[in-house]
Amino acid sequence: MPIVSKYTNQQFDDLMNDLITVLEKHKAPVDLSLMVLGNVTTNIINGMAPAQRQAITEKYVQALTSSVDTRHDTH
């Protein structure tokens, strides 16, 4: 079943491209990029109502895990 989002592909792509551009501008290596994005994620989740944090964290981890390509030939 396809995932339906309340955001347009354009909104998503624009924001993602802006974030990637900033990381590239700073020549951030993978580990630094992941550290920063992880902290941003934590700050966003901690800004939510406490009752929602655990559930959204579990959904986020599940989505991240399922979206990672585990094939060895990706790059």
Curated annotation (Swiss-Prot):
Organism name: Aeromonas salmonicida (strain A449)
InterPro entries tied to this protein: UPF0352, YejL_sf
Domain of life: Bacteria
Gene3D superfamilies to which the protein is assigned, alphabetical: YejL-like
Protein name as catalogued: UPF0352 protein ASA_2693
Pfam families named among the record's database cross-references: DUF1414 (PF07208)
Family to which this protein belongs: Belongs to the UPF0352 family.
